[in-house]
Amino acid sequence: MHNELKTIIEQAWENRALLQDPAVQQAVRQVVELVDKGELRTAEPVDPAKSEWKVNEWVKKAVILYFPIQPMRKMEAGELEWYDKMELKHGYGELGVRVVPQAVARYGAYIAPGAILMPSYVNIGAYVDTGTMVDTWATVGSCAQIGKHVHLSGGVGIGGVLEPVQAAPVIIEDSCFIGSRCIVVEGAHVC
């Protein structure tokens, strides 16, 4: 279904000079947009009954390739200012996601309808499913996969695993409760 995009991403991964081509940049941005919408994932369940997952390396490569093609820019919200390459996610009302003040998610992170973000942070490539609460000061790292009806308690750190691209991200399966101040990293799989 996404074979053409996959081919372009794999070629650009092997030859970074191709990132100068606007068509290649568009392909990278398209993959990140699909991740943002939850239509592509950096990792996905293969057999949920056995808790088996596969890493979509080419999607992770696209996320990594997104960084060098994005220009640095100033972003403002009232008197607050940021200077970064990554846009922030927006349109939460239309997405059906509750987001309280001080919560931040980067564009390229999927947050499902019914999820709740307390003052927290969700990084690019992450997937947060419906009914999940990312509680106060919790962080969801790049490419982490968080299931349905999960509670990431206050101060939880879910590590991100962008590289190496073949490495499994942190996976928290459906209905898990991760207690306050826990740190889950380096491809851990909680089910």
Which role fits each region the language model picked out?
Residues 1-97:
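Terminal amphipathic alpha-helical/low-complexity segments used for targeting or macromolecular assembly
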Residues 101, 106-107, 112-113, 117-119, ...:
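Left-handed beta-helix
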